[in-house]
């Protein structure tokens, strides 16, 4: 079991089980120096330290070294003798995530002809594509620690229903 744990610390990537997620948070904040980060073609990796985005890795394979990626030098863990970085890593999908449904009550209006109160409801379907991964992490994921699709789509649905307008 120890060999698998060591191997897991050498390679940083979103697991296959997270491929359908909009955001996946790497579970360990201690990242070994010279570990390899693998970012899928439809994702980016966002590095956060103390509530700030420190850097973004584009798709590809990257060796985590401060010489190759200068922003890593800002969060070297000196307690480890400089052999590790302390950072949160979020893998953010940049492809389109389709077929999310929403629906709910909008408002009550009075029918001018009959005088009856009518409850208006709306239903629809939407897709999500993350245009700015840094903003998503800073404004939604990082502040309320939301990383699963249900929580993110719940927030989006609430935003859609809150921006209602009755004509």
Which positions does each model-derived feature cover?
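Interfacial loop/beta elements and low-complexity acidic/Ser/Thr-rich segments
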Residues: 1-141, 145, 151
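Conserved small/polar residues in nucleotide/adenosyl-binding loops
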Residues: 166
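Extended, charge-rich, solvent-exposed interface segments
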Residues: 152-162
């Amino acid at each position: 079991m120890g060999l698998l744990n060591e191997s897991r610390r050498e390679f940083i990537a979103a697991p296959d089980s997270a491929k359908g997620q909009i955001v996946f948070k790497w579970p360990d904040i201690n990242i070994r120096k010279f570990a390899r980060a693998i970012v899928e073609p439809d994702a980016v990796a966002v590095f956060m330290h103390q509530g700030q985005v420190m850097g973004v890795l584009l798709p590809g394979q990257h060796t985590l070294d401060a010489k190759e990626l200068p922003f890593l030098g800002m969060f070297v863990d000196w307690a480890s003798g400089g052999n590790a970085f302390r950072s949160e890593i979020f893998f953010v999908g940049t492809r389109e995530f389709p077929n999310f449904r929403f629906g709910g009550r909008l408002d009550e209006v009075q029918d001018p002809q009959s005088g009856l109160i009518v409850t208006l409801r709306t239903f629809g379907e939407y897709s999500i594509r993350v245009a700015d991964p840094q903003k998503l992490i800073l404004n939604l994921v990082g502040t309320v620690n939301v990383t699963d699709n249900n929580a993110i789509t719940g927030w989006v649905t609430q935003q859609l229903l809150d921006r209602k307008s009755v004509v």
